[in-house]
């Protein structure tokens, strides 16, 4: 390893959503899982490589790099923007590694309260940077423009119909502040103008969702041809410039006249006036001109009467005249721009001669410059020169000077007659003509798009024309397809996890670009997840499926740089005993990674990973260092072949819980899972776990020769010894000490002092001890205490070169370096914003600490300067979301909520209903008051007092639509609404249909009865069955019961009718099956049979249990003599007091269910943190040691708690068990105890 190479961060793997972008400085930004990674361009001149990992806490939906990267301008120096899973848009500064500003314009209230409720996709909010550095973000209904400089945003309703277009991609033009392109799920590409808020072009052609868009400005094809012609003419002039010329008289100033007729001697297509201009006859000049220009002649316009012209003298003369004219300032200048010189009928690609780019807007001509116009005839037009054959597409260059008059645009054949035919113009040398023609090229803005079917299309955004297409032969649709421009002539696309290179050439016959496979670039990788192109260097960044990030040279197809990745939350680090440079990492994303520090260079971060079945919690190297054991989250222990990088086998432990401690000694792998210690014997053909039952509640283990050190869940440190002659048997603990209030987390042995070890736990104390093997004892050397009250140490690591240095990693986000030579000195503290899990000293340089945490992959910190400067703390990374300044809404234009047509219609309908209801209520109220006043006058005619009018306040309250209307009829009882559905209601009848006949259709039924038609009477008049036989009365009850069941009546009526028909059993059995029993059903069940009543009680108890009424259910179980079932029901639903009191009364004193209730009650109190109540119950149950252990769990031991612990220790005679480390003689236990 090069000692000068040091990466501060190890990047994380790419996330599930492929988001990557190339920074303007050549670096790579890509999104990981809840983080962003930046890798700088390959360093040069011995510079340090830069890798930055930034935790976002939430998943990322969109990522884009600002065009202002590296400019600063008083804001972030390296800004980029993301869209979080909570729909917030955040602007980050890569130089600071934190979010700076942002806005939450796309958030709704319920989403802002809890992000976990709604799971957004990448199409929820689309975001891209505009060319001016502002941010455009879009969702289904709104379009938000975020001004980064002022930290304000403006939200408008989108002009893209969400009903017709489901957006999948947005890319703003890097060449225009107002243009952006969006792709839809239907395969449309929309080019939109932000200033005009409309769709400029709508491109059709794709049949699958758009997956990628890329902009590019390229020179127009006709301009390239013109530049080639100008260069050829200049070369021809340089070859003939040495010929002698005759002295020439000073010619008159150059003039610009109107276009001449075809027979005019100054016609631009008449070349006779150019005789001897370059020292050659006319015929020879025509021949050479045709040869040099490929059959297309470039002519120069000449003034009248000048057969030969000395350009040098003309330039000097005109220069003097220009100086004189500027001094006099008499000439009125007319500015001519490129826009004024546009060709009227262009050929080549379907585009303007100009572009709407802001860059071209700034390239307007200035005084004294030379502008070039390109005239091109169509394929049907032809130009005849001196009677020769027609030559199609002849291009002619005109001199356009700034004092020339601007003619109105028209066809090349149309001539406009200005008021002044002649204007004086300055003359410029031929060299200036050629240079100006090269520099004034026209640019076309092309947009390439790719869909899910790998079909690419090129669009000309200047004219809205389709400019090219390739056809895919693949039938597989992919969502990871993407496209970039590598340069002006090469496009690179991603599909099927492969890169494809396409050459782009303009075809003049088809007036389109031809897309074909490019053979000069190649890439043979087939595991690419995402990529980004650095167009300035023509290099490609690749994010691969094997969790490596690399930069590839497309010309050679080889990886120039590659970087391994590690996910957040590395839970274990273990260096190989034979090769300390090889470090194994237990990752939280089902991987085991290997970091080979010896191969670390400026262009290589060597990390290889292997996929395993679950998250890895602990690691252990085999004695021969060829295999690695790992414990996982789901209770399995795997064995990995390091050389082949493959998992050999998976061993299942007795529990499906995390394996949080692992040791490999000889042929045995020891593990702890779910407070159980066991081991695997690898010599057996069928490997099964063996449980060690003599060790209770272990939390961590360490083996030293024949001694087993065990840290328990109660904070005790125990030592066990292997029985003589037995490899699998361990004696009960020989020695134990109470060190912590809670579980032991780590036991670390010093590599330079074989008997020194440190013990840490879920507490703020660290004990450094010395083991005495001959005496089977230990003694405390030092005790380090963290200054944080609620500290908890997750792991420790000793130095390999200095035996007095110890590293501890804390759950509150600290890494402390302790010095055993100066135990009273405060440690060097490295502060982070997340819990820290593990770490170590870098084997090659112990001035560098390598650590990992919950929101940290692997970070390397150099502490050399801090140690030399005697610093107390280092803060390498702060909370990235701590100092975000959220934007406010812009007040330039008020915001009105955007409603769709359906929502507006629904709102108007609700308003009409509310208004109509209000009118009815007011009318009823007025009518009621009139009736009351009339009644009062009638009852008391002598009272002449007028009724009071309605107060104005009451009328205004009635008009308020915001207030909830409390409409209740006069006959309505408010107490009835408060009653539960099962409460008794006063009912006047159970024959509702018969009552209806009497009240509403008595006359009609009477008419039927008077017809004396018995069949019609029996069919239509129910009340007639009351005056008939018993059979007819039963039919009446059956009809009424059917009606009651259909109407779901819950009163006593169905039971009352069933009692008379002797069908109560059927009624109750039906209610049991439907789980709709009530107490009245249970009360009536004994009238049928005792067995049915028992069934009803059990069914009703089960029904109440399902509804959550545990007390009701237990009561009915007790009534059936099912005491054990009722107590278990109380216990299962955490009714511990009720369960215990009934168990004391109903069960024998020796019943194990009583002890089960007490134990479950204690575990519940421990889980809720009520240690005082747990200790009280333990003392009452005569479990003094357990009560003492509960009081020790208090982190802040007050004098009151300490006094209670002393009393429990005294009463329970626990001095021999809880003696700590003070006695010199060990205290024995079990069969080896001394009496």
Swiss-Prot record:
Q: What happens when the gene is disrupted?
A: Late larval lethal associated with molting defects at the 3rd instar stage. RNAi-mediated knockdown is late larval to adult lethal; the phenotype is the same if knockdown is restricted to muscle tissue, neuronal tissue or motor neuron cells. Conditional RNAi-mediated knockdown in the central nervous system or muscle tissue of adults results in age-dependent decline of motor functions, including climbing ability and flight.
At what positions is Phosphothreonine found?
355, 411
For bias kind Polar residues, which ranges apply?
352-368
List, as start-end ranges, the regions of compositional bias called Basic and acidic residues.
Answer: 234-248, 963-980
Chief location of this protein within or outside the cell: nucleus
Q: Where on the tree of life does the source sit, at the highest rank? A: Eukaryota
Tell me which positions the record assigns to the signal sequence: none
Q: Name one GO molecular function term.
A: mRNA 3'-UTR binding
The record's region (Disordered) falls at 227-263, 340-368, 963-983
User: Which locations, inside or outside the cell, does it occupy?
Assistant: Nucleus; Cytoplasm; Cytoplasm, U-body; Nucleus, Gem
Q: Which InterPro entries match?
A: Beta-prop_GEMI5_1st, Beta-prop_GEMI5_2nd, Gemin-5, TPR_GEMI5, WD40/YVTN_repeat-like_dom_sf, WD40_repeat_dom_sf, WD40_rpt
Residue ranges of WD repeats: 55-102, 428-469, 475-512, 565-605, 611-650, 690-730, 739-779, 788-828
- Keyword terms: Cytoplasm, Developmental protein, Nucleus, Phosphoprotein, Repeat, Transcription, Transcription regulation, WD repeat
A GO cellular component annotation here is: cytoplasmic U snRNP body
User: Where, by tissue, is this protein expressed?
Assistant: Expressed in the brain and salivary glands of early and late second instar larvae. Expressed in nurse cells and oocytes.
Residues with Phosphoserine modification: 289-290, 351, 354, 357
Q: Where are the transmembrane segments?
A: none
Oligomeric and partner information: Component of the core survival motor neuron (SMN) complex composed of Smn, Gem2, Gem3, rig/Gem5 and one of 3 almost identical Gem4 paralogs encoded by Glos/Gem4a, Gem4b or Gem4c. Interacts with nuclear receptors EcR, svp (seven up), usp (ultraspiracle), Hr39 and Hr3.
Q: What does this protein do?
A: Component of the survival motor neuron (SMN) complex that catalyzes the assembly of small nuclear ribonucleoproteins (snRNPs), the building blocks of the spliceosome, and thereby plays an important role in the splicing of cellular pre-mRNAs. Nuclear receptor cofactor for the ecdysone-regulated processes of molting and puparium formation. Acts downstream from ecdysone biosynthesis and release to control the expression of specific ecdysone-regulated genes such as Eip74EF (E74). Essential in muscle and neuronal tissues for motor function, including climbing ability and flight.
Q: In the UniProt entry, what is the domain comment? A: Contains one Leu-Xaa-Xaa-Leu-Leu (LXXLL) motif, which is usually essential for the association with nuclear receptors.
Question: Can you say what this protein is called?
Answer: Gem-associated protein 5
Organism of this sequence: Drosophila melanogaster
